[in-house]
Swiss-Prot record:
Entry GO MF terms: oxidoreductase activity, acting on NAD(P)H, quinone or similar compound as acceptor; quinone binding
Transmembrane annotation, as ranges: 28-48, 98-118, 129-149, 253-273, 274-294, 300-320, 336-356
NCBIfam families noted in UniProt: PRK06076.1-2 (NF004741)
Family (UniProt): Belongs to the complex I subunit 1 family.
Subcellular location: Plastid, Chloroplast thylakoid membrane
Name this protein carries in UniProt: NAD(P)H-quinone oxidoreductase subunit 1, chloroplastic
Subunit structure: NDH is composed of at least 16 different subunits, 5 of which are encoded in the nucleus.
Membrane-topology descriptor: Multi-pass membrane protein
Species in which this protein is naturally found: Citrus sinensis (Sweet orange)
Enzymatic reactions: a plastoquinone + NADH + (n+1) H(+)(in) = a plastoquinol + NAD(+) + n H(+)(out); a plastoquinone + NADPH + (n+1) H(+)(in) = a plastoquinol + NADP(+) + n H(+)(out)
Enzyme Commission designation: 7.1.1.-
Main localization category: plastid
């Protein structure tokens, strides 16, 4: 059977069309993910610059100033330097665990950004259990640290990995109980719904005023989860050289460095979403005729304003963990565990009980 030439051309053009549709579908999926990763990377560079400038101000010294004006590109220069460092492997360690550990830590933290609503219409995955997805994913990162410590075949690294796992377990429970209290107030586990519930009552509807005890517990627990001073025992230089990072160099060491600041940024973003109203400014925009509220703005303008408000709240809040790092001394391991199990856990349980009682009485 001979097929006519026009029919063959039609079949070829149809197959090309299907191939183009498949390519466009892949690009449609990869484009927002790539934009998110690029934006998050820029956000990390900004945090590194902010920390260096704030720490310089606290210590009354000049911060980075040689790599571009005001040292803005200093973090990028440091990252480029790490890329060209030699990638060393421990001679008697487990090379598989040693190599996989940093990747697990970074990927687990990056996935947490998928449920953060940067604006009302801008969230990568609006899930009904978004806030619990963040808690579940963040629990994977310490596994990567433990794998890194075990695979290094170094007693300091292994002890640092054990400390990271113990610290994460100790402070994840109070943090989860604080999140449960917020979910009870909002009647939802979706991050978008939690932001929307706070916007109903304006500035005074922020969960910061309705959950002051939970906010303090969440702040302390998130600092411990990020392993920031005074909770940086897994990598205490005076005790463990560099903890689970002792045997790392080059890009793998850079991954741990990036993971630390990614975790700090995502924790600050969740503080903004859970307690500071998210993308809602809660005051009218006086430059728009008719006093149109920013919260009700639609389209590109509303999305842009929402992103700006979210990031402004986040970076203003970041001053607290940065200033804390350069002002408070490191806790001992027994003090850290006592603070988590004997102090924060009972307080967070009591806060959850009070929140549940108030919700039942309001029915």
């Amino acid at each position: 059977m001979i097929i006519a030439t026009p029919e063959v051309q039609d079949i070829n053009s149809f197959s090309r069309l299907e191939s183009l549709q498949e390519v466009y579908g892949i690009l449609w999926v990869l484009a927002p993910i790539s934009i998110y990763v690029l934006a998050i990377t820029i956000g990390v560079l900004v945090i590194v610059w902010l920390e260096r400038e704030i720490s310089a101000g606290i210590q009354q010294r000049i911060g980075p100033e040689y790599a571009s004006p005001l040292g803005i590109l200093q973090a990028l220069a440091d990252g480029t330097k790490l890329l060209f460092k030699e990638n060393l492997l421990p001679s008697r360690g487990n090379s598989s665990l040693f190599s996989i550990g940093p990747s697990i830590a970074v990927i687990a933290i990056l996935l947490s950004y998928s449920v953060i609503p940067f604006s009302y219409n801008l969230v990568l995955a609006d899930l009904n259990i978004g806030i619990f997805l963040w808690i579940a994913i963040s629990s994977i990162a310490p596994i990567g640290l433990l794998m890194s410590g075990y695979g290094s075949n170094n007693k300091y690294s292994f002890l640092g990995g054990l400390r990271a796992a113990a610290q994460s377990i100790s402070y994840e429970i109070p943090l989860t109980l604080c999140v449960l209290s917020i979910s009870l107030l909002s009647n939802s586990l979706s991050t978008v719904d939690i932001v929307g519930a706070q916007s109903k009552y304006g500035f005074w509807g922020w969960n910061l005023w309705r959950q002051p005890i939970g906010f303090i517990v969440f702040l302390i627990s998130s600092l411990a989860e990020c392993e920031r001073l005074p909770f940086d025992l897994p990598e205490a230089e005076e005790e463990l050289v560099a903890g689970y990072q002792t045997e790392y160099s080059g890009i793998k060491f850079g991954l741990f460095y990036v993971a630390s600041y990614l975790n700090l940024l995502v924790s600050s973003l969740f503080v903004t979403v859970l307690y500071l109203g998210g993308s809602n400014l809660s005051i009218p925009y006086i430059f728009v005729p008719g006093l149109v509220e920013i919260n009700k703005a639609d389209g590109i303008f509303g999305t842009t304003i929402g992103i700006f408000i979210t990031l402004a709240k986040t970076y203003l809040f970041l001053f607290i963990p940065i200033a804390t790092r350069w002002t408070l001394p490191r806790l001992r391991m027994d003090q850290l565990l006592n603070l988590g199990w004997k102090f924060l856990l009972p307080i967070s349980l009591g806060n959850l009980l009070l929140t549940t009682s108030s919700q039942l009485l309001s029915l």
